Amino acid sequence: MHTPFNQSAAMPASPASSVSQTPDKSDHGVGFDAGKKVKGRKVHALVDTEGLPLRVIVHSAGIQDRDGAARVIERIRHRFPWLELIWADAGYHAHQVDAVVAKVPCLRIEIVKRSDYMKGFVVLPRRWVVERTFSWFGRNRRLAKDFENLADTLAAFISIASIQLAVRRLARM
């Protein structure tokens, strides 16, 4: 799905970098993330530099961000062997993630940190790409709020929304 879009956008055929971040998604209990004080599910998304998802994983909010990131990287390493760089938020800075990244040749992870001097909302470089993608997902009626009982159902609707994004972009070109 990425190759036709990248070719029509005059970009390299393979995404060379991606962004990863975890938003909160649900009101009903599937797990509890004590760090963010969120009950429900988490969605880990790895998107290319244009905002199109490469891989999305949905799981209980009780699983730490670092463990979810390790799962995402483990699942993409064979599908996208040309991937060179992942920008991630500070929740992904851990030894578990570094161990998985070390298994993938030429892949490195760069943590985008917020400055200690900044107060309030600040647009962080590279993080806004994935935030924008989650905003696009939020426009979809089925993804505006997590009404699904199964994590696989939510992942399927995210896949459908991703296909809609890609098709609309291709239609505009």
Residue ranges, per PLM feature:
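Short alpha-helical elements
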Residues: M1-M173
